[in-house]
Amino acid sequence: PDKSYTPLEALVLDTALILHMEHGGGNNSSFTTHVVTSSGSDTYSVMAAALCSLKGPKHGGAKIKVVRMMEDLKKNVRDTSDEDEVRAYLNRLLNKEEFDKKGLIYGMGHAVYSVSDPRAEVFKSFTKELADEKGRSGDFALYNTVERLGKEIISEKRKIYKGVSVNVDFYSGFVYSMLDITVELFTPIFAIARITGWSAH
């Protein structure tokens, strides 16, 4: 509310912006910049098209889905420290019986990364420190549990043998919420960072 940040909060937000800045030309919004630029269109039109792509729940909107899914989990699981209860919820999630009934554990899986998303690994180390500072270690522990169990359950149910890992979206929304950034600003913050990459392309 007073618009001031602790040194750790500033470092975490800075890291978030850096991690979202660029990620190759294969992601949806960066690919969109290639397509629109190839027609000879101007920079403003290219950025507008990239923003439209980023808005989708499978791209820039994924952080919001993770946060909403975790809220739903807390609402529907009596004891979030009970791994059996969390596992049962995640199974119901994949069976399209919970949350938005899409059969997805949001923030899990990536088109390229199977062992780990290096951006998520960097983010996770800062997330723990911030959670400790903000008195949200319990929430961080729940995210850890969902990460661990989610990998197992997806691999078992979907027969994914190459492995599955959390992506950068998994912890991003949690970090933004600890920084008191509203959900409505999650995707615009992503865009602020990613415009650097779009411009480079």
Regions found by a protein language model. Name each.
Residues P1-H201:
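Non-transmembrane, aqueous-exposed alpha-helical and coiled segments at domain scale
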